[in-house]
Amino acid sequence: MPGATSAVGAGPVSGTVRGQRSTASPRRSADPGDAVVEWFDSHCHLQGAYLSGAGDEAGGGAPGSTAVGPGDTSGPDGAPPGGHALAGVLARAAEAGVTRLVCVGTDASTSLGAIELVRSLRSPGSAARAEGVDAWATVGLHPHDASAGVAATIGVLEEALAADDLVVAVGECGLDYHYDHSPRPAQREAFAAQVALAHQFGLALVVHTREAWDDTLDVLRSEGVPERTVVHCFTGGPGEARRCLDLGAVLSFSGVVTFKNAADVREAAALCPMDRMLVETDSPFLAPVPHRGSANEPSRVPLVGAVVAECQGVDRELLATTTTANARQFFGV
């Protein structure tokens, strides 16, 4: 398939550049060492109810994760154990050197909310502008919500993709056989439709998978793997990593890589070529150690990056520089 062997760091990514590049100067990282480095949170949820902290903690596991337990929220169907005000989130992100982020949609409402949030963050006088943080949006239908009118939702997403250049990817989308909140045929239908949207608009694809590796990769093969495809919140082991990499996908590592029971994820991080990886928080879910169980936020990307750097056997400054360049190229920003 076209571009299947293309790596994020191996030359220009084809497709239209969407949005504007940030001119912000990197702040100091909050990570040990405190060197001036710049980080890119490639996957977070900062819109609407995600930051409110309303509702009960669902417990048990975040999207895509096989290495979670009590105290970690379950993703789009659960609320964080405490909300953080957006202005404070942005200030802490900037202080930690996180100057770019992608706000991810999971259904029609949160996708439109991501666009609205990013547009407001880019407006003159916004907290993000004041802090030097730049942001982009994605639109997608999470497998948990795949039974809620796939055709109508895909239509809304398609309109948003056509109308707004702040949207840099389709997703998150994929298959979740752990919770099975939607029938599996509906999940596969929604996933295939969004792969088609990524091809139609020449955009990146953000993939969610949990306990569904075979079917996820089968859908990608049958629909054609978009040239820029990332398996977000990667929670597989070396075998799953190799299968994804062989398809031309990029792996994005989250706070799961810091968990004591995620040795297989660290093995995957060790073998993944550094130009084929991104780092993310999946905020407000999956806070890294030592904050596990609390509401997560982009400022904690350096904690994820520090562990991935250790797995790679490189210093965190190189990991930060490389993954930031990877993310900018991957999303075309």
Language model region names:
Residues 1-333:
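Mid-domain alpha/beta scaffold segments of enzyme catalytic cores
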